Amino acid sequence: MLNETPALAPDGQPYRLLTLRNNAGMVVTLMDWGATLLSARIPLSDGSVREALLGCASPECYQDQAAFLGASIGRYANRIANSRYTFDGETVTLSPSQGVNQLHGGPEGFDKRRWQIVNQNDRQVLFALSSDAVSYTHLRAHETELH
């Protein structure tokens, strides 16, 4: 299921939320901004359902948190100290995003961009960043794992 929110993402367009379900009863909610996981509700053997993710109260709150909750991390994961590295003997300088360091792709990381929804149904979604030749799929049918 695909829904738009009245709240607008940093690019001025509504956040697009997707809800996926599988045969095991798992329900996952994602948004196209940052290809972000918002919720993963897992059925337990006693019949109850448990939320498996930490998250924010609303899609727009994800812009103001620094913990990368549910985020798609990239172009790289982790910290680049002092926002620079050496490649083929040349120093490459990056924009800092956490103090003097760059973290998880920096100010223009994958979590801060709108991903294209290439293909989507009730059981899976394929997101892509065509400019970076990056794509990934969430939740396949008959599984209780995210891939």
Residue ranges and their predicted role:
Residues 3-61, 65-69, 73-77, 81-92, ...:
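Beta-strand-rich N-terminal accessory domains
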Residues 24, 131-133, 143:
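Short, well-ordered turn and helix-capping elements at secondary-structure junctions
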Residues 76, 93-120, 130-136:
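Covalent nucleotidyltransferase core used to form phosphodiester bonds in nucleic acids
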Residues 86-90, 117-124:
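A short, structured loop/turn motif at beta-sheet edges
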Residues 93, 146-147:
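General alpha-helical segment detector with a strong preference for membrane-spanning helices
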Residues 137-146:
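Conserved small/polar residues in nucleotide/adenosyl-binding loops
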